[in-house]
Every structure is written in structure tokens, then in C-alpha cells.
UniProtKB/Swiss-Prot annotation:
Residues bound to [4Fe-4S] cluster 1: 27, 66, 100
Protein's UniProt keywords contain tRNA processing: yes
Compartments it resides in: Cytoplasm
Domain called MTTase N-terminal: residue spans: 18-137
Cellular-component GO terms for this entry: cytosol
Protein name: tRNA-2-methylthio-N(6)-dimethylallyladenosine synthase
Gene transcribed to yield this protein: miaB
Residue ranges constituting the Radical SAM core domain according to the UniProt record: 160-397
Family named by the database record: Belongs to the methylthiotransferase family. MiaB subfamily.
Molecular function GO labels: 4 iron, 4 sulfur cluster binding; metal ion binding; N6-isopentenyladenosine methylthiotransferase activity
Subunit details: Monomer.
Catalytic activity: N(6)-dimethylallyladenosine(37) in tRNA + (sulfur carrier)-SH + AH2 + 2 S-adenosyl-L-methionine = 2-methylsulfanyl-N(6)-dimethylallyladenosine(37) in tRNA + (sulfur carrier)-H + 5'-deoxyadenosine + L-methionine + A + S-adenosyl-L-homocysteine + 2 H(+)
């Protein structure tokens, strides 16, 4: 137990409103959870700190952490060390650590960073406001980790940042046992929401003006086998049925999902994707390795032949679908022959984009105990070869699109060079990032959330350029909301950038991708 100085101020006495920041590391599930954490804090009376504020400028800083890769640990504890002097100078400041790393390291976070005030896990997000109050009142650090899910995150308040796109969680947890992954032990076995609850959430989002939803789960193809409601019968076809049901929601223009698992990917899902107009022609299908021997060691319950068969079926049903993947380089025991097999599959499939990871040894996973851990220099050299090949393929595939007309959902915050290049940015239906030029008459009219069409004029490995002007422009309610700065913030609703993973990234940083399925 870590005690605090007795001089912690009571903001209720001063009348000031405490501000907060939520910093997110890892996968899209963490992004979804961070929306809920922000919503909980706002419902409790906290105010979001200015977007340009540095880490530590807020009264409360929450780190929502990832435990998948070693860099996540280093990044968290580096940031906590950075905050230590600020905490000493401002004892009223509170620091909370949650998420997968907190769930894993519940007994060590405070020993490594004793100035932390709150440690909470993946199953009790809703406890954060109470823990903050308790820590301030008792002047003692609060550690609360529970081992089973208390509430679906989607039942908690949400503070969404996007007027046009939202995450919708369909399940939590995972029933797989990949040897490299610690997530199932931290998030628990899969638990599925009822279709009625999911569709009600989607309909509420659309009523708020949202145009695109991403259905989110650790393994969406297993949806329907572990319903939380015991009255619902196990149904292997539930995910395909859910996609088709989303297709009947008036005003919902784009549906995405992530992530499926090749072992459980079935043809009824492919049919639903192809036959449901608002389901986007994009598929993120983790491969991890092109070697059957390595897949077996990873405990991935499929082999390359099955994977390629799925890709063939998808391309037959949706010839222009963008297919993205996850790849791990340097898994223990991986030989040059194994790695060459991965390169062969990459050449065959021609992924639109790939999240490429160097294997990271994680304590608590079976892979950490395997022999044949590879030298970093070998892993780095293979990684560079894989990235070079995928970059080449990305460029070739994107060049094919020059001259094509594409529909874009205009976004905000995705074009880092937009101001310098006098361009704006949108996402095509297949998930590709497109930077487009604004004609002077259009500049004030096009808002994030609006729909436009443009012609592709240039290509790069991770984006397209459309400098021939805007061909058509359709104003939307999402655009109206953005223009009015009235982002919907609702109980039980989800958020944020357009579908994951984003086409336009070839390698996964620890801050954007996290756990690979």
C-alpha cells in the first residue's frame, strides 16, 4: 500500500472542474474502452483537457495499456517516469493505469512507479471514477483488479470524438490459445452480446448521424457460440446474420468488422459481405506466418492451404476487395525456409496492406518458453525484407487505381500533411486513405462526415492522391454535426476513426495496432 501526502486539495471546495486525459496504447479494443473511460469521467463531472495539452497537464491522466509487446511496457513506464516530477510538484494530480498491462502486472505497477494513484484492469472499467474519489479521500493508492467481466463496455457512458464513425463491440474475450498471445488470459473467455443489443446500439448511432460502424471483437467469426444471455441458443451463423441485419438499417452507409480468424471463417460470411450493399469490400484476415510448421507452433488452428482457399473465395465473390493482414517475423524456431514460405504467400495474395510485427517475447505466454529464440539481428533483417516486399506490392496495387473514380467519407485528423499540401483526406469504401485537393469553391462546403467522389491521379504505397478536383459532394447529418461542433456523446455508444485496421500502414506501431489475431 502506498500512502499519499495529506495536503491533497478538495476541488469541491474551490469550485474548479478537474480535467482529464486518456492515453491509449494497443489494439482497437483498447480504443473502444478508452471512449468508455472518457465517458465515465465526463459523466462524473470531469472535463476533457485541451487536445494540445501535454501529457501531465491534466488533473487526471489515465493510461489504457497494452501487454502484447515489450515496447508497450517500456513506453508506459517511460511516460510514468516523465510524470514523476510533475506529480511531486502537484500532489493533487492523479495518475491511473488500466488495461491489459495493468491486469497482467497488477502486483508490480506500484513497485515500479509508486507515484501512480490507481491501478485497474480490463474487467472493471466502470470502477474508475469511484477509485479516483477513494484515492483522493483516503490518500492511498487504489488497486482493483477483477478476474471476470462485470459489464459489457458498451453499457457504459461514452465520449465519442467522431461524428461519422463508431466502434460497436459485439463480444469481449477470446477462446483461442495462440502461443504468442497473452490477451485471452487478460480479457478472459469470449462472451457475446445479443444481436438485439448490438442492433439497437447501431440504430442509435445512426440516429445521431453516424454513417459507418466497425463491429469489434477479438474473433468476430466465433460470434454466436458464447452468448451472455443463457436464453439465446448457440448459433454458428450469427455473425453472417448480424451483417445482413446491419444491411437493413436505413442511413447506415458503411459496415466494417475486425478481426476474423481464418480457422472459423465460413462461406456464409463471404456471401453476406458480397450481398449486403453497405458492408465494405475490405477484409482484415490475419495470416501471422506462411509456414505450416510455424503456424502449428503458434497454435493457429489453420494451415496455409485453408488460408489461401478463403482468400480465393473472397476474391471470387468480391473481386475488388482490399485484403489486409497481420504478420509476425522471427517466431521462435523460424528458419529461413519458413520465412521464405511467408514471402511466397505474400506474393500470392498481394495484400493491400500488412501490419508486420517482429516477434516479442512475452512472459506468461507458451512461446516465451520455446527453444530457438532468434537473434535480434536475424529478425530485423527478415523484417526489413518483408516490409520491402510488401511496400512494392502496395505500390503496384495502388497504381492500378489511377484514373478510377472513388467514393470517400471525408475524415479529420488522418492527413498529417494536409495543411502543408492544401489537401484534405478521406477513406474509400475499401479502406484506402485518399488525399484530395480542394477547389476554392468547395473549401468551405466539404466537412468531415460528408461524402464526395474524386478521381485518383497519383499513388503511393500507403495512400492515394486525387488532385483533379471534387466530382460530387453530398452533405450529411454527420457533416452538419461536425460543423456545429456538436459531436454526439451518449450513454452506451461507441466511436472513432474509420474502420480498423487502416489501409495505409505497412507496419504496426505499438500505439496503433497492439494485439494481432
Amino acid at each position: 500500500m502506498v500512502t499519499r501526502d495529506a495536503g491533497m486539495a478538495d476541488d469541491a471546495a474551490t469550485g474548479s472542474t478537474r480535467t482529464y486525459q486518456v492515453r491509449t496504447y494497443g489494439c482497437q479494443m483498447n480504443v473502444h474502452d478508452s471512449e468508455r473511460l472518457a465517458g465515465l469521467l465526463e459523466a462524473a463531472g470531469y472535463q476533457r483537457a485541451a487536445d494540445e495539452a501535454d501529457v501531465g497537464d491534466a488533473d487526471v491522466v489515465v493510461f489504457n495499456t497494452c501487454a502484447v509487446r515489450e515496447n508497450a511496457d517500456n513506453r508506459l513506464y517511460g511516460n510514468l517516469s516523465h510524470l514523476a516530477p510533475r506529480k511531486r510538484n502537484n500532489p493533487d494530480m492523479q495518475i491511473a493505469v488500466g488495461g491489459c498491462l495493468a491486469q497482467k502486472d497488477k502486483h508490480t505497477v506500484l513497485s515500479k512507479a509508486p507515484w501512480v494513484d490507481i491501478v485497474f484492469g480490463t474487467h472493471n472499467l466502470g470502477s474508475l471514477p469511484t477509485l479516483l474519489d477513494r484515492a483522493r479521500h483516503n490518500k492511498v493508492a487504489q488497486v482493483e483488479i477483477v478476474e471476470a467481466l462485470q459489464h459489457f463496455p458498451s453499457s457504459l457512458p461514452s465520449a465519442r470524438e467522431s461524428d461519422y464513425a463508431a466502434w460497436v463491440s459485439i463480444s469481449v474475450g477470446c477462446n483461442n490459445s495462440c502461443t504468442f498471445c497473452i490477451v485471452p488470459s487478460l480479457r478472459g473467455k469470449e462472451v457475446d452480446r445479443s444481436p438485439a443489443d448490438i442492433l439497437a446500439e447501431v440504430e442509435a448511432l445512426v440516429a445521431d448521424g453516424v454513417l459507418e460502424v466497425t463491429l469489434l471483437g477479438q474473433n468476430v467469426n466465433a460470434y454466436g457460440v458464447s452468448f451472455a444471455d443463457p436464453a439465446l441458443a448457440r448459433n454458428r451463423g450469427s455473425f453472417a446474420e448480424l451483417l445482413r441485419s446491419c444491411g437493413s438499417i436505413d442511413g447506415l452507409e458503411r459496415v466494417r468488422f475486425t478481426s476474423p480468424h481464418p480457422a472459423e471463417f465460413t462461406y456464409d460470411v463471404i456471401e453476406a459481405m458480397a450481398q449486403t450493399p453497405n458492408v465494405c469490400p475490405s477484409l482484415h484476415m490475419p495470416l501471422q506466418s506462411g509456414s505450416d510448421r510455424v503456424l502449428r507452433a503458434m497454435r493457429r488452428s489453420y494451415r496455409v492451404e485453408r488460408y489461401l482457399g478463403i482468400i480465393g473465395q473472397v476474391r471470387a465473390a468480391m473481386p475488388h476487395a482490399a485484403i489486409t493482414t497481420d504478420l509476425i517475423v522471427g517466431f521462435p524456431g523460424e528458419t529461413e525456409e519458413d520465412f521464405a514460405a511467408t514471402l511466397d504467400v505474400v506474393r500470392q495474395v498481394r495484400f493491400t496492406a500488412a501490419f508486420t510485427f517482429q516477434y516479442s517475447k512475452r512472459p506468461g505466454t507458451p512461446a516465451a518458453e520455446l527453444g530457438g529464440q532468434l537473434p535480434k539481428a536475424v529478425v530485423q533483417e527478415r523484417y526489413e525484407r518483408l516490409v520491402e516486399l510488401q511496400e512494392q506490392i502496395c505500390m503496384e496495387e495502388n497504381r492500378v487505381l489511377i484514373g478510377r473514380i472513388v467514393e470517400l467519407l471525408v475524415t479529420t485528423g488522418e492527413g498529417r500533411k494536409d495543411a502543408r499540401t492544401a489537401r484534405r483526406t478521406g477513406r474509400a469504401r475499401d479502406g484506402r486513405l485518399v488525399h484530395f485537393a480542394l477547389d476554392t469553391p468547395w473549401e468551405a462546403q466539404v466537412r468531415p462526415g460528408d461524402i464526395i467522389t474524386v478521381m485518383v491521379t497519383e499513388a503511393a504505397p500507403h495512400h492515394l492522391i486525387a488532385d483533379a478536383g471534387i466530382l460530387t459532394h453530398r452533405r450529411t447529418r454527420a457533416g452538419d454535426a461536425h460543423a456545429a461542433r456538436q459531436c454526439p456523446r451518449s450513454i452506451g455508444l461507441g466511436q472513432i476513426p474509420l474502420g480498423m485496421p487502416s489501409v495505409g500502414q505497412h507496419s504496426a506501431s505499438i500505439g496503433s495496432a497492439g494485439c494481432a489475431r
